Amino acid sequence: LHLLHNIDNEELAALYHGATALVYPSLHASFGTPIVEAMSVGTPVIAAKGSSHEEAGGSHTIYITPNDSNELAEKIDLVLNNEELRQNMIKRGKQYVTRFRAEVCAYNILNCYKRIGIDITDDRYF
């Protein structure tokens, strides 16, 4: 376990990529950005149930009951020792998180406006 502070984006991506798994048991996170960041570079994720983590990680993350250290240890052991599971989490996780890329989100927002009849490329909106 390493507690790091003031990590730049490039170093953070390298740390995620070099990790065997991201363990994210937080219950008080907002969206779960670390989950998406880890999955985007191919790092399997174990996260707590009951927050926005399920949206961030989808079905390609292993979820644990909050404050259950035995379950957490069991799931860490599972990810460390089941290569087929790890590779599946890596492959499907990378595919899943593409939905959170900036250009995909921007495209979806533009389409929402179009569906309600607003062309935000019109100069009136700037």
Where would I find each of the regions flagged by the language model?
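Nucleotide-activated donor-binding/catalytic signature segment of Leloir-type glycosyltransferases, i.e.
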Residues: 1-10
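A short acidic/histidine/glycine-rich donor-binding loop in glycosyltransferase catalytic cores
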Residues: 44, 59-65, 78, 94-95
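C-terminal alpha-helical cap of glycosyltransferases
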Residues: 102-126
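A short, well-ordered alpha-helix in the C-terminal region of glycosyltransferases
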Residues: 71, 85-99, 111, 115
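Acidic donor-binding loop of glycosyltransferase active sites
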Residues: 14-33, 43-44
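Conserved acidic donor-binding segment of nucleotide-sugar-dependent glycosyltransferases
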Residues: 6, 62-69, 78-83
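Short glycine-rich donor-binding/catalytic loop of glycosyltransferases
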Residues: 27, 43-57, 66-69
